[in-house]
Swiss-Prot record:
Sorted UniProt keywords: Cytoplasm, Elongation factor, Protein biosynthesis
HAMAP family named in the record: EF_Ts
The gene coding this protein: tsf
Keyword Protein biosynthesis recorded: yes
Molecular function as annotated in GO: translation elongation factor activity
Any single GO BP term: translational elongation
Job of this protein: Associates with the EF-Tu.GDP complex and induces the exchange of GDP to GTP. It remains bound to the aminoacyl-tRNA.EF-Tu.GTP complex up to the GTP hydrolysis stage on the ribosome.
Protein's recorded name: Elongation factor Ts
Length: 284
């Protein structure tokens, strides 16, 4: 049987990022053959990823990549905020974003397939389920800028614009803070407006106001509603005395489109009863 040296284990660990004991066991199984040991670990990594696939991944980070006139914003999920802060996990998320910008995949499934080997490797290293939840690519003749909020990288935006990068970045910060649904009123679908109009009309009628007054109330509320949900209509967070549209115009900048994500939006997190887990473990 081949001798398994500390250097062999260290080299395999450096190549795979896995634990010392896992690497040593793989080398023993491979009878000292480095390539075979690496293959064994890759196979086991895939099996481990499969076992973890059913576990909810609701934490994670956002990452972006801009490759010329192509930009991508991605959300990559894991199970705990502890792993979300791990440098290896963050590096994987950045790799996913770079891959999305370079390859411009048509779906999450296609992007996931492109990064599957790297996903299995980081799952094997960190021991949590991970997944590419969503992404968006903007391929444009215009300019692109991204803003990721805070060290935890859980909220962010990719902005397509014309004009000043500094101004566009400030507007990106506003988008993360104020959460507009779209750029302008023209992008709000008629069904949404009519639904709001119906609600406001019923409220006005119920208040007993005269018809002409009620109609003015409804139109006023519609204008307020549109201002609240559109980027251009919102009061600019850095100067509430002007709208984003006014700030943009006076600084020679126009936002064409944006995509905004917040990690975990819409994912139901499983409540963990740690006391029950400890009690169950004590019975084993």
């Amino acid at each position: 049987m081949a001798e398994i040296t500390a250097k062999m284990v260290a080299d395999l660990r450096a190549a795979t990022g896995l634990g010392m004991m896992e690497c040593k066991k793989a080398l023993v199984e491979a009878e000292g053959n480095f390539d075979k040991a690496e293959e064994i670990l890759r196979i086991k990594s895939g099996a481990k990823a499969g076992k973890l696939a059913g576990r909810t991944a609701a934490e994670g980070v956002l990452a972006y990549a801009i490759n010329g006139n192509v930009g991508a914003l991605v959300e990559v999920n894991c199970e705990t905020d502890f792993v979300a802060k791990d440098a290896g996990f963050v590096e994987f998320a950045n790799f996913v974003a770079k891959t999305a910008a370079e390859k411009k995949p048509a779906s999450v499934e296609e992007l996931s397939e492109l990064v599957e080997a790297e996903r299995k490797a980081i799952i094997a290293k960190l021991g949590e389920n991970m997944s590419v939840r969503r992404f968006q690519v903007i391929d444009t003749a215009n300019q692109l800028v991204a803003y990721i909020h805070g060290a935890l990288a859980t909220e962010g935006v990719l902005v397509e614009y014309k004009g000043s990068e500094d101004v566009a970045r400030k507007i990106g910060m506003h988008i993360v803070a104020a959460k507009p649904q779209c750029v302008s009123e023209a992008e709000v679908d008629a069904e949404t407006v009519e639904k709001e109009r119906h609600i406001y009309t019923e409220q006005a009628i119920a208040s007993g106001k005269p018809a002409d007054i009620a109609a003015k109330m409804v139109e006023g509320r519609i204008r307020k509603f549109l201002a609240e949900i559109t980027l251009n209509g919102q009061a600019f967070v850095m100067n509430p005395d002007q709208t984003v549209a006014q700030f943009s115009k006076e600084n020679g900048t126009e936002v064409i489109s944006f995509v905004r994500y917040k990690v975990g939006d819409g994912i139901e997190k499983k409540a963990v009863d740690y006391a029950a887990e400890v009690a169950a473990a004590a019975k084993v």
